[in-house]
Amino acid sequence: MSEFATSRVESGSQQTSIHSTPIVQKLETDESPIQTKSEYTNAELPAKPIAAYWTVICLCLMIAFGGFVFGWDTGTISGFVNQTDFKRRFGQMKSDGTYYLSDVRTGLIVGIFNIGCAFGGLTLGRLGDMYGRRIGLMCVVLVYIVGIVIQIASSDKWYQYFIGRIISGMGVGGIAVLSPTLISETAPKHIRGTCVSFYQLMITLGIFLGYCTNYGTKDYSNSVQWRVPLGLNFAFAIFMIAGMLMVPESPRFLVEKGRYEDAKRSLAKSNKVTIEDPSIVAEMDTIMANVETERLAGNASWGELFSNKGAILPRVIMGIMIQSLQQLTGNNYFFYYGTTIFNAVGMKDSFQTSIVLGIVNFASTFVALYTVDKFGRRKCLLGGSASMAICFVIFSTVGVTSLYPNGKDQPSSKAAGNVMIVFTCLFIFFFAISWAPIAYVIVAESYPLRVKNRAMAIAVGANWIWGFLIGFFTPFITSAIGFSYGYVFMGCLVFSFFYVFFFVCETKGLTLEEVNEMYVEGVKPWKSGSWISKEKRVSEE
């Protein structure tokens, strides 16, 4: 984990250093004494072989399981809107007696989930500050379950299903804030990027298995088509609640609440060492100094997020932009409407093609678990933006110029369709190893503890709002301009490349306290990869 780092409070032109010695003296009157900082100043949790991290990896996978229920929803809803029983119950009848979902109703059913997520992230994420990240996660999963029950109970009223989507979205919004937060505050710094990426890994697993379940139920003629996938998600949510009982609470939250012995036990459990280990004492020293610094600054407010004090505002803006740009890569164009898209390119069984996309997405995320800590956040984001832009140029150009050589009322070109599917798979590969996990990693690492949940809620809320806009308007836009829609996302990807270069700092290999120090110092993003903390600079001298 981290070395001892002196925390600082900026007050006007004065700089006050807050050392951990007073905190240690205070603790000696409250709980079992902790050795003074001088004995362990240079103690640090060293990097270990991967086998030594199996305990914390398993814990982080359980915390990240919240991403699975989100991914399952994304994977299943893309099939629901094309299933016969779903359209019969919640759609409208044509003059020939067949049923369909209008563009408006499809957009609302698919997109409203994201509005629920945005609202849930902004409101329910606060539970993590009140009751702890772990208990907060359990509460928001319960909200999600309520929404699932309402959807399962829907019979023929589309607005009942619509309401259930809003409520389940609120639960997922809370999960999206609390799950990466708890992982980032629990995982050792050497594998923190990888562990936070588990959240995206679980999303991709959920999408893939959701596609598979749709394929398995599509031949039924009744509500089994969509109620079975929803029922399975209910079971998965119950499993996550049970799993949270085995997960330790965030040591940083515990220190903030004065539960120092519990914090030491949490750190020791995550790192497979004893609570007396010098590195645990040094880590506690660092966390306590940082928490005390934030406590002296007073209670956090929403207004503080929009002030320049402590370089908070630039980080809030960066988080909003990163999460917005993740949606504007165009990934959900494929994930929400993949089945519809591949119907358009002439695939006989578009459900099978969606499964292929799910496999590519899931398998590629394993690559991201390696690259995020090997190459760093900035390089992965920059490379992902460039690669995905190229994929969209080819996908859209082929779709516009070659897919229908004899007109849209004639059969499509199989060769052109195959090229589009190949570049769709390549797009998903590049997305899965870059923007998919790292957008969550960046926001989970960038904020100080006292404003973290609120800042993350705003950032992730921006993601959900863009998700709604894309989910709702995509049917209308594709009806109007077809595959030229891809050029819009290509432009967004070009913008994202330059935004990352000029505004996103590298956080690879830094403790959360060091990340905060780097932002306070005002390090230029393109120079952040070589930045080292003040304490390390002093020790090297």
UniProtKB/Swiss-Prot annotation:
> Pfam families in the record, alphabetically?
Sugar_tr
Q: Which residues lie on this side of the membrane: Extracellular?
A: 71-107, 156-162, 214-227, 348-350, 401-418, 478-484
Modification N-acetylserine, positions: S2
What up-regulates or down-regulates this gene? Answer: Repressed at high glucose concentrations.
Q: Which residues carry this modification: Phosphothreonine?
A: T29
Q: Which GO terms describe its biological process?
A: carbohydrate transport; D-glucose transmembrane transport
Q: Does the keyword Oxidoreductase apply?
A: no
Positions of the region Disordered?
Answer: 1-22
Keywords recorded for this protein, A-Z: Acetylation, Glycoprotein, Membrane, Phosphoprotein, Repeat, Sugar transport, Transmembrane, Transmembrane helix, Transport
- Glycosylated positions are N82
Q: Name one GO cellular component term.
A: plasma membrane
What task does this protein carry out?
High-affinity glucose transporter. Is only indispensable for growth on low glucose-containing media, because S.cerevisiae possesses other sugar transporters.
Report the family membership.
Belongs to the major facilitator superfamily. Sugar transporter (TC 2.A.1.1) family.
What does the miscellaneous comment read? Glucose transport is thought to be mediated by two kinetically distinct systems, a glucose-repressible high-affinity system and a constitutive low-affinity system.
Q: What is this protein called?
A: High-affinity glucose transporter HXT2
**Record organism:** Saccharomyces cerevisiae (strain ATCC 204508 / S288c)
- Gene symbol here is HXT2
